[in-house]
Regions:
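Serine-hydrolase catalytic machinery in alpha/beta-hydrolase-like enzymes
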Residues: 1-45, 57-58, 62, 84, ...
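Primarily recognizes the serine-hydrolase "nucleophile elbow" in alpha/beta-hydrolase
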Residues: 35-91
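Sec-exported extracytoplasmic/periplasmic mature domains
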Residues: 31-38, 60-68, 122-126, 188-192
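Stable alpha-helical elements in mature extracytoplasmic
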Residues: 22-29, 51-59, 63-66, 113-120, ...
Length: 196
C-alpha cells in the first residue's frame, strides 16, 4: 500500500492506493454525526482538492444517497469512476481547474479531461441550457465560467477554467467572490431533492 495521506476514490478493490474503505468511513462518520448532532442529512456536501476532489466525485458516483452536491478543485474522475458511476439522484457539480495542472491534466491523460468530466455530469443531470461564458481577469489569470443549468431537479454543472492555473487550491476573486464563497454559494443552493 501507499503510506502517504490519501483518499481511496473507488470502492474497496478498485483503482485505489490502499485497501482502506474511505466510503465506509464517510458513511459511519455521517451516521455518528446525525446520531449525536442535529444535522440535515439532505444537505451534506463534498468538496476536495486534488485526490480529495477525485474522492468527492467518488462520493457522487458511489454514495450519492449521502451527498447533495460536490465541488472539485484541481481534481478529476478516473476511468473506473466514469465506468462505475451510479448516482441515485441528479447531482450538482462545480469544478475549478487550471489549464497548466501537471497532475490532473486539463486535457486529460489517465484521468478524464475537464471537458469529459463536464460532459459526463451535464449528460447525467440532463442540463438544458448553457449560459453565456463569464470571463474575469484576476492576478494575471483569465478565469472563464461555464454554467450548464436547468437540469433534472434544477441541478446544474458549473466549471471555472483557470487559464494558466497550476495544480493548486486557487485563491481567486471572481466578481467579488473568493473561491470559498463561490463553493458555498453553489452547494448551499441544493439539497438531495434539488434546488432550494
Amino acid at each position: 500500500g501507499d503510506d502517504s495521506s490519501h483518499w481511496n476514490f473507488d470502492p474497496v478493490g478498485g483503482d485505489n492506493k490502499s485497501t482502506v474503505d474511505d466510503f465506509g468511513f464517510v458513511d459511519a462518520l455521517l451516521d455518528n454525526l446525525s446520531s449525536n448532532y442535529q444535522i440535515n442529512r439532505d444537505r451534506v456536501y463534498a468538496a476536495g482538492f486534488s485526490n480529495g476532489a477525485a474522492f468527492a466525485f467518488g462520493l457522487a458516483c458511489y454514495q450519492s444517497e449521502n451527498i447533495a452536491a460536490i465541488v472539485s478543485v484541481s481534481g478529476s474522475m478516473s476511468p473506473t469512476q466514469q465506468e462505475g458511476c451510479n448516482p441515485q439522484h441528479p447531482t450538482p457539480v462545480m469544478s475549478i481547474h487550471g489549464t497548466q495542472d501537471s497532475y490532473f491534466l486539463y486535457q486529460g491523460g489517465y484521468y478524464l479531461s475537464m471537458d469529459a468530466v463536464t460532459n459526463y455530469w451535464t449528460s447525467y443531470n440532463q442540463t438544458q441550457t448553457t449560459q453565456p461564458t463569464e470571463t474575469v481577469s484576476y492576478d494575471g489569470l483569465i478565469i472563464e465560467k461555464f454554467s450548464h443549468t436547468q437540469g433534472n431537479n434544477s441541478s446544474k454543472v458549473d466549471h471555472y477554467k483557470i487559464n494558466g492555473g497550476y495544480h493548486i487550491w486557487f485563491d481567486i476573486d471572481f466578481n467579488g467572490q473568493s473561491t470559498e464563497d463561490l463553493i458555498w454559494d453553489f452547494v448551499s443552493g441544493f439539497d438531495k431533492n434539488g434546488a432550494l
